[in-house]
Curated annotation (Swiss-Prot):
This protein's UniProt keywords: Oxidoreductase
Family: Belongs to the MsrB Met sulfoxide reductase family.
Gene: msrB
Domain MsrB: 6-129
EC number(s) reported in the record: 1.8.4.12
NCBIfam families, alphabetized: peptide-methionine (R)-S-oxide reductase MsrB
Cross-referenced SUPFAM superfamilies: Mss4-like
GO CC annotation terms, alphabetical: cytoplasm
One GO BP: protein repair
Reaction(s) catalysed (UniProt annotation): L-methionyl-[protein] + [thioredoxin]-disulfide + H2O = L-methionyl-(R)-S-oxide-[protein] + [thioredoxin]-dithiol
Xref: InterPro entries: Met_Sox_Rdtase_MsrB, Met_Sox_Rdtase_MsrB_dom, Mss4-like_sf
Name of the protein in question: Peptide methionine sulfoxide reductase MsrB
Pfam families to which the protein is assigned, alphabetical: SelR
Amino acid sequence: MDESKKNERLKQLTDIQYNVTQKADTERPFQNEFYDNVAKGIYVDIVSGKPLFSSNDQYDAGCGWPSFTKPIDEAEVIEHRDLSHGMIRTEVKSVEADSHLGHVFPDGPQDQGGLRYCINSAALRFIPVDKLEEEGYQTYKKIFE
């Protein structure tokens, strides 16, 4: 992502969006936009707009954050060891904008790969299926057909 474009986009973020994506903060569980979203669509990086997750892979993990079994394209996320807060975790970041997204844990549904991508709503923008074409994401309609 072009640095000037990224800087312009960062200026448009809310405080929570900026703190989550740029400072690796975590939003409060059960008090965020998408933890209980059941609409069909895709979730894109709030900074770059790159598609990251699909509602087809979303499930209620009971943790208070949107949870997914996998990203749409594994090449769009990168994982790093995270030793903050006295824990050993795996941080998930977006490749394009280097946004902190959340963490991935090995306690997801076993029949779907066993992973739980626990992602901050503040790092995402949701595009409903009926808006995919209008928003320029028409190639992703096929995953809902």
